[in-house]
Amino acid sequence: MQVSLMANFIELKEATTNPDYGCPPAERDIEAHISMGVVNLDKPSGPTSHQVDSWVRDMLHVEKVGHGGTLDPKVTGVLPLGIDRATRVMQLLLEAPKEYVCLMRVHREVDEERIREVLGEFQGKIFQIPPLKSAVKRDLRVRTIYRVDILEVDGQDVLFRIACEAGTYVRKYCHDVGEALGAGAHMAELRRTAVGPFTEEGLVTLHDLKDAYQFWVEDGDETFLRECILPMEFAVGHLPRVVILDSAVDAICHGADLARGGIAGLDDNIAWGDTVAIMTLKGELVGVGEASMSALDIAAADGGLVIETRKVFMEPGTYPRMWR
């Protein structure tokens, strides 16, 4: 079994994988690596996220590039990009938790202790109405603020890190904090520092990506390009895993739901209704599904369908058909 077994991984049966089919993500040839790759891009201030997509598409001479989680033009930081076949994987990041570093400007002097007190109150579940310039309907919604860390207070400037549920508007968050302070406040600067498994560690600039591509094209050196472009499997690192047998792969590729007998192992933190990444024994992403029961219930089940397949990313025929 070629999947690394972490402490929270339940191995249901000993299994081996046939080396004649599929390919471990790290061993894909460079063309496949690019067309099934993702980039942890450091978006600069200025362009829209769609403009960045277009630049990278032209830079790499590929057909499609898409991003996971739009950033406003002036916002910098983590912008995950999917290339060609990996563009659909970006959809899985839309609901992933996000993290930002924000510079909030309070409109008049307020005691620092009061600022800390109010920001402490704006954690957990909060109510938000999207701002006027948002692309969604302006209905009252509940969002979860997982953590707020104040990094620095300098007069009317408050620098803080916020970890929040997808769909949280940090600009509106600053406005609401300002209202609670009785002084007013606005978001002066914003940088995204994490989207699901994508963090500031390993960020790639547009210049890095262009240089890496040129090294490969002109010198045949793909080392730097492989560092800049990651396997698409990286993009599901925030999801719990279900690892399946070779014999189950092609059925999933054709849209079948996953039966208990096709599972080699799974993470023990899976709850009913969770979105899970369906992986091969070689660590390839087959698709994603919705758990019909918890990990412990799956492990105890005698058989039956346990994962409803929602999206398929692997091409049918990658593994041999072993189903009727």
Swiss-Prot record:
Disulfide bonds: none
Stretches assigned to the PUA domain: 239-314
Record's catalysed reaction(s): uridine(55) in tRNA = pseudouridine(55) in tRNA
Molecular functions per Gene Ontology: RNA binding; tRNA pseudouridine(55) synthase activity
GO terms for biological process, alphabetical: box H/ACA sno(s)RNA 3'-end processing; mRNA pseudouridine synthesis; rRNA pseudouridine synthesis; snRNA pseudouridine synthesis; tRNA pseudouridine synthesis
Keyword Acyltransferase set for record: no
Keywords of this entry: Isomerase, tRNA processing
Documented EC number(s): 5.4.99.25
Record-linked PANTHER family: CENTROMERE/MICROTUBULE BINDING PROTEIN CBF5, H_ACA RIBONUCLEOPROTEIN COMPLEX SUBUNIT DKC1
Name this protein carries in UniProt: Probable tRNA pseudouridine synthase B
